[in-house]
Structures are given as C-alpha cells and as structure tokens.
Amino acid sequence: MKTTLLWTLFLIDSSSGFMPALLAQQQQALVQGTVEDETGAKVAKAAVKLFSEAGETLNAVTDEIGHFEFTGVGPGKYLLQVKFQGFASVESELSVGASATVAQRIQLKLADASEEITVSARRESDPLDADQNATSIVLDHDLLKDLPTKNDDPLAVTNLFVDPAANDSQRDPKIYVDGVEGDTMDVPRGSVKSIMVDTSPYSTKFGRPGKGRIEITTRAGSTRRYHRRLGYNIRDAAMDARNHFDSSSSPRRRQWLEGAVDGPLIGDTSTFFVGGDFLRDNDNAYVEALTKSGHESATVLIPRRTVHLFGRTDTRVTPLNILSVRYNWGWDNWKNQGVGGFNLPERGWASEKRIQELRIAETATPTPNFLNQFVLYAGLRNKTYSSVSNAPAVIVNGAFNSGGAQISRKDVEKDVEFQESATYFRGLHSFLFGGVLKSRFLDYTDGSNFGGTFQFSDLTSFVNAKPFLYTMNLGDPRVTFRQHEISYYLQDEMRLLPHLRLLVGLRHELQSNLSYHKSLAPRVALAASTADGRLVVRAGAGIFYQRQPVTMEEQFLLLNGTHERSAVLSQPGFPSPGNIPNTVPDSVLRMDPHIRSPYAIQASLGAERKLGQEVFITADYTMLLGRRLYGTRDINAPVATGLRPEPNFVNIGQFETSGSSESHNVTLGFRTTLRRLQLITRYTLSHSIDNTSGMSFLPADNFNRQGERGRSDFDQRHRLNIAGVLKLPYHFNLALISTFRSGIPYNITSGFDTNNDTVANDRPSMGNVYAPFNSFGVDGSFISGTKGVLYSGPQALFGGTLVPVNANNVHWLILPGVGNVGRNVGIGPRMADIDLRLSKKLVLKKAENKTDTTREVEFRSDVFDILNKTNYRNYVGTLTSPVFGQPIAAYPSREVQLSIRFSF
C-alpha cells in the first residue's frame, strides 16, 4: 500500500511538469519572413533577432533569397529586430498565438541615423576588447574644437599624452592619417574628425606601441544636409605679455583662417567634404649671444605661411561597398629658422615644402562578420632648404654662432603604397590580417657646408683667431635611390571565458636596403574583468620594430666617398683656412655591415575601474626596453698613441645599431564624460635611460658606447596633463589644458676637443662636488699654459689671466682625454602652463527639418599661459661659456587669441 501511494504521488508530480510542456509544444508556432531593400532586392545574411518578454533571444540569418524563420516559438509578445551593415535597423512588435503567424516582410532603408556613410563589421562593444582600453586617449571633433589650442592645432593636445620613450631614437611619434603612416599631419585642422592615442597598444596592424603613435580620422560629408563653416583666429603682441628675452616689446601677429563645406553629392549615396586653412604667422626669435663686442640681444622676425587644401568623397557603390577618395595639398614657407639663443640673425635659413597626397579606399562588407579594405596611396613631397647667407659658418662654443647656416638641400620623394586589411568574426574569435607594400623613390641633393665651417672652443680662441677645426664638403651633392618597405600581420582576439579575452598576433617587417629579414614581432595581450564588467585588468607584451629612416641612406650614399668628400683641417688659419689640396685626408661615412632594424620590447600591466556611467580611473605600469638602437661612431678615432687606425682618412663615421634604452613608467588616469563636463587627466611617473640620442649621435668616447649611458634627452620624472571642457548655461563653454612637468636633463661638456677626435662633445671630469657649480679648472695645454698644470677656468677664459688652482677647489676639471662625468647629468628647468578658453555660441536660426542646417556664430577667447610664468627651454651646458648653467631661451609668455566661427 505504501509503495502504491509513492508511485501515485510520483506520477502526479511528473504529470504536472510534463503536461504543460506538451501543451506548449502543441501551441508553438513558426515565425518567418523575408528581408529586402528599398528596391525590392532580397538581402542575404542579414542578422535577425527575436526577443521575448521574458528576456530570451532567438537568432537567425537570412539566406540567399532573404528568407528567415524561427521554429518552436511559444505564444506571447515578441520584438523582431533586423540589422544589416549600411542600413538602418528595423524593429517591429508581433504576437504569436496558437494559429499560424503571418509571414513578415521587412524592408530596410539606407542608414540616415549617422550623417556620414560608414560601413563596418564588428561585434557590439565589449569592455574586454583590445581597442576598448580605458587608458587610451580619444578626442572627437567636438572636444577638439572646444579645447584651447593655438590655431586650433589638434596635435598640440594629443602630443601631451604621447610617451617619447615609445619612439626610441626617433623622437617624434608616428602619425596615421586614415590609416596611412607618416611623420606629419598634412591635412587642414578642420578636416579632423577624431584623434586617438594608445588605442589597442599591442595591435599587430601597427609597427609602433600605442603610446608612440597618433591615429587621425578625417571627416566625411553629411548625407542629409549641407554644412558651411568659416573660422578666423588672431593673436597680436598688443594683447600679449613680453617674452622673457624680448627687451623691446617687438610687434608680432599671427592670423589663421579656415573654412569647409560638406554635404550630399548624389542623393544619400554619395557625400563630399571640401576644406582648407591658411596661416600667416609673423613670429619672433630672440638672440642672446656673447660676441667679441660683448653681450648682444636682437629680435628677429620669423615669418611663416602655410596653406592646406582637402577634398574627400564617399560613395556607397552598392549596399555592401563604399568607395572613398581623398586628396590633399599643402604648402609651407618658413623663413629665418635656426635664429635665436647663440645663433645670430645671419645664421637663418629658409624652407619651402609642397606636398600632394591621394588616397583611394574601397571598403566591403560581404557578410555581417567580414570586412575588407583595400587602400591605394600616392604621395609627392618636394622640400627645399637654403641659407640666408653663403658666408662660412663660425661656431664659438658657448658664446655665439655667426656666418651662414651652411644649409642647402632639396628633397623630392614620391611614394606609392598598397594596403590590404581584413577583419573576420567567427564564434568566439576575431581575426585581423593584412599587409602593406610601400615604395619610396627619392631624389636627394645636399650642398650643405660647401662654404665651410670654423669651430672655436671658446670666445677667447675666437678673439685670438685660433679655431681648432675647419670642415668643408666638396663634390657631387646629388643621389637618387629607392626604398621598398613590406609588412604583413595576423592576429586573433579570442574569448577564452565569459570574462577573459586573449589576443595573440605576429607582425613581420621587411625592408629592401637591409640584408636582415628576420624582424618578427610577436604580440600578446590579456584582458579579464569582474562579473559586472566594472573592473578590467589588462596585461600585454610585444616586440616593435623600427624602419631604417631614408635620411640614413641619403647620408650614407652621399658621404661614402663616391659623391662628396668632406675635408677636415685641424688648427686652420682664420678667416681664411688656405687652399684645400686634393691630398688632404677626407672624412667618410659608412654603414655597419651588421646593421639591422632597431626594436623595442614592451610589457605592461594595468587596471581600469568604472565608477559611474561615464567615470573611469586607470592605473598602468609599462616597461620598454630598446635594443639595437641607431647611433654613429667614429671607427677611425685616434687610439692611445694619438694615431688613427687608417691614416688615409680623418674621420670614418659609421652608422650602427649598437644603442640600447630602458624606460619604466607608472600612469594614473581619470576620465569622465558627464552631462556638462568632459575631463581627461593623466599623471605619469617615469624614468628613461639610454646610450644614444639618435641616428647621428656621436659618443664622447668612440671606443666606449656604454659610457654614454645616462638619462634620456626627454627623461622627465613627473608629468601631469589635464584637458577638460565645462558646458555653462546660456551656451557658454569654459575649457582648460594644463601641463606640469619636471625638468629634462642637459649634457655638460667641456667645450674643448680633449681627445683629438675633431668633435667638441667631450665631457669634463668631476672635481669637488661641494665646490661652486660654475667653478672649473682647465689644463694648461688648452689655454697656452703649462701642460699638466691646472688653472682657474673662469679667470683664464673670461679674465685673460692664468691663475693656478687646486683640483679640490673647483667643481669640474677639463683634462686631456676622456672625462668621467656621465651624459645628461644636468637637471633642466621645470615647466608649468595653464591655457583657458571661454566661448559663447549664438544660435541665429535653428534647423526646421532634417535637411536644414542650424545657423550659429561662436565667439572664443583663449589665454595661453594664463599664469604668465617664465618657462625656460633649458640651460647652457658648455663649461667654457660665460652663461654656463643659465637659460638663453624661453617658451612664449602669456598670449591671447581671439576667434570667431560661423556655421550655416
């Protein structure tokens, strides 16, 4: 009886679960339909989703005839959603009952939610994606135009957040304009849509780490309405504070004009954008020199004129294909460059640059999960450099530089580049693969120093007409060559767990003028988050290769002894060195046969915390090791006997990759985008050391590169950058950019060629560290005294008297041979700068419909360096200079810029 009762209860319980399910199966229905475009053409592979009120989601993809279906759909109310790239998404409500559901007919329209034609294939945003790192800096067009910048230059903002250590010996970041790599931004400022720094730092698509590159996207035209914009900026000395080294309140004026027009070209399938800007800059440079006649100050006009023109069209050729064509032209004429500080007005030189670029891109999305882009790029760059004076150059260390600049150069470069890249999503994987082929054709003419250069150790040597060196180039100044660069990459970003994502990839770099072809760059990145996604931890590591710069090949081909010869005379006559016979030994330039591409190894660990809807705090540590960095070494420098290994030559400079660097930095960040406030804050604690400053850097001791190991030229322990915009009532905006930095180092040199290698970059030895900083002793062999006797340097060089001194009574010692003071031991000045902008927008007429344009005018007032704090550039590091340890140049003091912008 008991057993029978248990079985009865079991059957009742089971039937209570199975019977409703059986009834539900009997009531389940079929939901089906077709998807087509406005012309009636069926759309294949559209994404279709069916959402239930309970939160469940069913997914389907249309077949070749645009058909979709969902089987086993229970009764209830549902939301049907259809999406396809390039079209506006469609949503419709439907009810499913016991009877058959009517077949759905969905018609897609071309997307007009966005005013630009775009096409892309990607998943919905995931905080774990490699390109969603909160440590990146993303500045859209609205934020860029609101921040206080001189002449609306967007790079003035983004350069604040670039890590110079990520560029190794190439100090400037790489700039990618619409995916094309370059060194400058040659498009109008108003054509910039957005700028990004440090997005997806380990992406194999790029050769540089994230903090060493700037990605710029240009603007496309609107599909719905026409926009016309006109802006004008002016800065005038009458509104500015006087520069610290300007003794006469010199006049100066800068004017900048920009305009743009964009809108639909052919219906809503084609758009255009045309823009340009013009800069008229009459700036000043300030000379602070010590000549034979005494202290000399002068203000020199530095006129500059630039023009940029830009045109772009975007056409939706088919629903799945977009053709984009961009052309830009630029002209830059800049006179009296190089003047200021120790450089007298006659040392000026002028440059004229012309650039043309054409970019054609075809973007296709054959399926919602696949995107392919092909880019054809062609560029023409014409650059000319010429000196104001052709007189021989006179370089007096630590005092003044006069004569001509001895610069005469013409560069013509023609570039052709092909890019192919693809993104493919499959299951838990996101694949990225592609390649770049770039050919560069160069015609290089360099007649620099054909007029000769005299070098003096100090002002006393100049007064006594005793230069220690004279150099002069002779021969054929023209070379032509080509350089081919190839790179290809592959990466897979995969989801290992719901809150764990891994990126692995490989990049391979090849270059035609390098015999080493094993530049393989593996990358790996890992991202993990908490269940709610508000805390993300990222780690990564990778190798990044540099390309050999074309300037290295240019200099090698020109000065290897087959085109030009460089004559070097020690202890020449002055002002005439005399005739230079053909028998004088030359100096040549060679390339290390074992040279290869420099590379950096980067590793990082960081955390990102989302505090509110749009509030993020970040912290990350980055280590970067540079290996095989560029440098130059004189392999024919005198040995201990005073003789050169190859007596038929003076100097044999050799380009090589023997340098190294090491950088560590910790960065704390805060970013918020609230209703009225946008704020970006970055604080960086860093330290960087290396033993080379770049391709042309010569060590003080040519037999000991490691002796140059010291603080990097750009090393700054502390950097704090803040950028923000506060929207005030009545269409007022208040914006700020502030920068606080500790000092960069400066190198302390003796001013003499103490090791007889014809280069006055030798450093002193250390005396008594407690003696006055500007006190030094000099061996008599350098100042017509007794060799081996130490004399007071200031009295001998500045007072004209030889007074013996004890080594314990001076801070520095100038002795024959190599000094023991390290490189970059001087500590430069700190910097503090705050820039503000107050703007007011007046709406003249609001848009009445989606094809109309709001007409408005905006007034802006910018104040740069509102604190009016004197920020020196750096200190003089030449011991033999009367102004050793003092500044001779400063950044601009407080400046005011007034602007007006029309939009209609």
Please name every model-derived segment:
Residues V187, T204-F206, A220-Y226, I266-S270, ...:
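Short loop/turn motifs that connect adjacent beta-strands in outer-membrane beta-barrel proteins
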Residues N513, R596-I601, K610-F904:
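Short, solvent-exposed micro-motifs at the edges of structured domains
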Residues G210-G212, Y226, Q255-G259, V307-G311, ...:
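Hydrophobic, lipid-facing positions within transmembrane beta-strands of outer-membrane proteins
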Residues A121, L230-D236, V274-R280, V325-W329, ...:
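Transmembrane beta-barrel strands of outer-membrane/channel proteins
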Residues A88, S92-Q107, E115-A220, D236-D246, ...:
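Periplasmic N-terminal accessory/gating domains of Gram-negative outer-membrane beta-barrel systems
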Residues S250-N333, A350-Y377, R507, P522:
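Transmembrane beta-barrel wall of Gram-negative outer-membrane proteins
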Residues A21-L128, Q132:
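Periplasm-facing N-terminal accessory domains of Gram-negative outer-membrane beta-barrel systems
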